[in-house]
């Protein structure tokens, strides 16, 4: 029985035809029993495809449809779309899924209601409202389409009456007439899509699957924007089909497409937010603008760093280092008897000449905001090449090296000529791994305020006694057991310092020069091993240049002839009472045999051919040291007339840090050497009276 439109009849909604679609037979049985209690005419179906067939065969056989959302053969939303396009019946969705997004999806697809399982009796009693609402909307549309011709015929008369009313009634009547005119114009605009010639109701057309497919083909042929009812009707060419039928179906089809587009847009937006083209404010955790404004980094270095981080090719190179720890020590100031003599750690960025360095390992793409660099090649440092290239790259490439932080890189080694660099006072120089691999025509000459720290560990600086922080320190890159091996380095402010030579645990000896204000005695000391005697000169640091070139023997030689030992004779005598032999085998920072005897004896200077040329330090004290078990390294055979790893004037210190090129104010210091190419400086190892 069809529902009564006014709702006042006693029989309504008795006999309202309801189609229930659900794959659960139990749910179907319960719903059918509840609908019968509400005095509805209920029909059940367990398959969505079969229900769609029943609707197409007998569209007027049902007033409302109740469908489950999740079904195996067809989704409930798909059934909702097909029913909305073909039959235009009210559809109520039901499901045990009460999520808001699922309910919203059903409403967007055109469902008039959404019931949550288990369905209550009160909800089923009120489903007739959707049927009445649907019928009311259809009747309203037909009334508007039927009164269109009457509106067109009465428009001139109404306009004349309005103008007459405005002339007779004054301003108030004019405002009312204009308002009525605007309302009628709006109504005319809304009714333009209808058929002007239709003055009576037309029979409803059942849009079957074949008819709807013809309609869709016609729309696709014309295009959704250019499809109009007249052209669609011509393309379909179906007898009995009117322009009004096509216009109504086209309107529903467009609404359906609009709902689908809105649904897909709403689903895609949370997962695909619009891409923002924000500018890169900082890279690698660095605020470039703040650095440039505070003057901590020059504009050229800023541009080079930005280019490197952004992956653009540039001649500048940034060396952030392997680890992100930097050498941050406070500036330590010492006495200044000869001018500027302070060593500052954590200084600003050093720069060198454009042709000082060449190719470094190229940076890989940034990870975590900072560019990563490939591993440095573990090459030994050889300086036989004098063509001005470093690592295979010409000096003319003008690569500016910006040290972002002073960091330690154990595996990093530079290869090439470094003779164009001098060490700046208060600079920090990091030597390479092993100094016994030097091969150059010039020696190494650090200036008086130069600090050479081991490249292997930064613990050397932290463990440095306070007294050593006042003077320059020169140490090898290998861990020096003599610097950390139980030696008291506290300056006792005595008039003389005892003699000690440090020997490291690696291939090279540790090397420290402090240049105290009061120098030790003048005698040249010697300590012998079974094979190699070598000189130790107190208060010596630089290589003397007044003697003939020294001859360094190879591993098979029994002795090393030295020509570096001329020292001034103005030093005060040394208090030999400070020297004492030890009962334990702590000698030069190493543990040896207990057969150590100590004495002093003057040693003549010898030239490169073994001839005595004079005493370097005439004095009254005579003592010597004997040791049978001292670990001493030997130099490889590098040829005659070359200084293997010695420190001399006019050369540079190999370092992975770039420093400014400047001449040292002090160049007249003397040197003495050991068998492994290290400078033995006795005046800086103070031990409180014992060795």
Swiss-Prot record:
Where's it found, cell-wise? Nucleus
Following inactivation of the gene, the phenotype reported is: Dwarf, narrow leaf, lesion mimic, low tillering and late heading phenotypes.
Q: SMART domains in the record, alphabetically?
A: REC
Q: PROSITE patterns recorded for this chain?
A: HTH_MYB (PS51294), RESPONSE_REGULATORY (PS50110)
Q: Where is the composition biased (Basic and acidic residues)?
A: 139-155
Question: Where would one find coiled-coil regions in this protein?
Answer: none
Q: Which Pfam families match?
A: Myb_DNA-binding, Response_reg
Modification 4-aspartylphosphate, positions: 68
Q: Which residues bind DNA?
A: 199-258
Stretches the record annotates as Disordered: 139-204
Q: Which GO terms describe its cellular component?
A: nucleus
- Keyword field: Activator, Cytokinin signaling pathway, DNA-binding, Nucleus, Phosphoprotein, Transcription, Transcription regulation, Two-component regulatory system
One GO-annotated biological process of the protein: phosphorelay signal transduction system
Chief localisation class: nucleus
Nucleus among keywords? yes
Q: Which residues form the Response regulatory domain?
A: 17-132
The UniProt PTM text for this protein says: Two-component system major event consists of a His-to-Asp phosphorelay between a sensor histidine kinase (HK) and a response regulator (RR). In plants, the His-to-Asp phosphorelay involves an additional intermediate named Histidine-containing phosphotransfer protein (HPt). This multistep phosphorelay consists of a His-Asp-His-Asp sequential transfer of a phosphate group between first a His and an Asp of the HK protein, followed by the transfer to a conserved His of the HPt protein and finally the transfer to an Asp in the receiver domain of the RR protein.
**Gene Ontology terms, MF aspect:** DNA binding; DNA-binding transcription factor activity
InterPro entries in the cross-refs: ARR-like, CheY-like_superfamily, Homeodomain-like_sf, Myb_dom, Myb_dom_plants, Response_reg_B-typ_pln, SANT/Myb, Sig_transdc_resp-reg_receiver
Q: State the family it belongs to.
A: Belongs to the ARR family. Type-B subfamily.
Biological function: Transcriptional activator that binds specific DNA sequence. Functions as a response regulator involved in His-to-Asp phosphorelay signal transduction system. Phosphorylation of the Asp residue in the receiver domain activates the ability of the protein to promote the transcription of target genes. May directly activate some type-A response regulators in response to cytokinins.
**NCBIfam families (alphabetical):** myb_SHAQKYF
Protein name, entry field: Two-component response regulator ORR21
Task: Give the organism, scientific name.
Answer: Oryza sativa subsp. japonica (Rice)
Q: Gene encoding it?
A: RR21
């Amino acid at each position: 029985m069809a529902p009564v439109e006014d709702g006042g009849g006693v029989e309504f909604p008795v006999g309202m035809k309801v189609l229930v679609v659900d794959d659960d037979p139990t749910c179907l049985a319960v719903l059918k029993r509840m609908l019968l209690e509400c005095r509805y005419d209920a029909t059940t179906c367990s398959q969505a495809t079969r229900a769609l067939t029943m609707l197409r065969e007998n569209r007027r056989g049902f007033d409302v449809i109740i469908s489950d959302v999740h079904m195996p053969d067809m989704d409930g939303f798909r059934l909702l779309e097909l029913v909305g396009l073909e039959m235009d019946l009210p559809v109520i969705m039901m499901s045990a899924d009460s999520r808001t997004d699922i309910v919203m999806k059903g409403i967007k697809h055109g469902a008039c209601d959404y019931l949550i399982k288990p369905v209550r009796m009160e909800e089923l009693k009120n489903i007739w409202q959707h049927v009445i609402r649907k019928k009311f909307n259809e009747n309203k549309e037909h009334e508007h389409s039927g009164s269109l011709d009457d509106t067109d015929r009465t428009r001139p008369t109404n306009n004349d009456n309005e103008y007459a009313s405005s002339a007779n009634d004054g301003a108030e009547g004019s405002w009312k007439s204009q308002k009525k005119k605007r309302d009628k114009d709006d109504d005319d605009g809304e009714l333009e899509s209808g058929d002007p010639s239709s003055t009576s109701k037309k029979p409803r057309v059942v849009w079957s699957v074949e008819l709807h497919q013809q309609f869709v083909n016609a729309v696709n042929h014309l295009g959704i924007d250019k499809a109009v009812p007249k052209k669609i009707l011509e393309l379909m060419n179906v007898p009995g089909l009117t322009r009004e039928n096509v216009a109504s179906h086209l309107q529903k089809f467009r609404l359906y497409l609009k709902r689908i587009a809105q649904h897909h847009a709403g689903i895609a937006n949370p997962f695909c937010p619009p891409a923002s083209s924000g500018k890169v404010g900082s890279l690698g955790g660095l605020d470039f603008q703040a650095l440039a404004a505070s003057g901590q980094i020059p504009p050229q270095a800023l541009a080079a760093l930005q280019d490197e981080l952004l992956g653009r090719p540039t001649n500048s190179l940034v060396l952030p280092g392997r680890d992100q720890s930097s050498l941050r020590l406070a500036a330590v100031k010492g006495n200044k008897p000869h001018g500027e003599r302070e060593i500052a750690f954590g200084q600003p960025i050093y720069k060198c000449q454009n042709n000082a360095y060449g190719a470094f390992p190229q940076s890989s793409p940034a990870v975590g905001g900072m560019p990563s660099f490939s591993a440095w090649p573990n090459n030994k440092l050889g300086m036989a090449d004098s063509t001005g290239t470093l690592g295979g790259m010409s000096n003319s490439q003008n690569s500016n090296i910006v040290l972002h932080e002073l960091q330690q890189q154990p595996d990093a080694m530079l290869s090439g000529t470094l003779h164009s660099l001098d060490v700046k006072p208060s600079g920090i120089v990091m030597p390479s791994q092993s100094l016994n691999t030097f091969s150059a025509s010039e020696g190494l000459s650090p200036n008086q305020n130069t600090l050479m720290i081991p490249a292997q560990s930064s613990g050397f600086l932290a463990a440095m006694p306070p007294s050593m922080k006042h003077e320059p320190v020169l140490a090898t890159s290998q861990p020096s057991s003599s610097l950390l091996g139980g030696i008291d380095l506290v300056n006792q402010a005595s008039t003389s310092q005892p003699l000690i030579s440090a020997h490291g645990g690696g291939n090279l000896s540790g090397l420290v020069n402090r240049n105290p204000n009061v120098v030790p005695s003048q005698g040249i000391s010697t300590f012998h091993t079974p094979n190699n005697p070598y000189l130790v000169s107190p208060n010596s640091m630089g290589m003397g240049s007044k003697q003939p070139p020294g001859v360094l023997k190879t591993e098979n030689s029994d002795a090393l002839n030295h020509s570096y030992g001329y020292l001034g004779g103005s030093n005060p005598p040394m208090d030999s009472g400070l020297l004492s032999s030890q009962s334990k085998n702590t000698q030069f920072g190493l543990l040896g045999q207990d057969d150590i005897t100590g004495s002093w004896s003057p040693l003549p200077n010898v030239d490169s051919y073994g001839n005595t040329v004079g005493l370097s330090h005439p004095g009254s004290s005579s003592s010597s040291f004997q040791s049978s078990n001292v670990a001493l390294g030997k130099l490889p055979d590098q040829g005659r007339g070359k200084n293997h790893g010695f420190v001399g004037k006019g050369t540079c210190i190999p370092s992975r840090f770039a420093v400014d090129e400047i001449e040292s104010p002090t160049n007249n210091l003397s040197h003495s050497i050991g068998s492994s190419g290290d400078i033995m400086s006795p005046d800086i190892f103070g031990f409180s009276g014992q060795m």
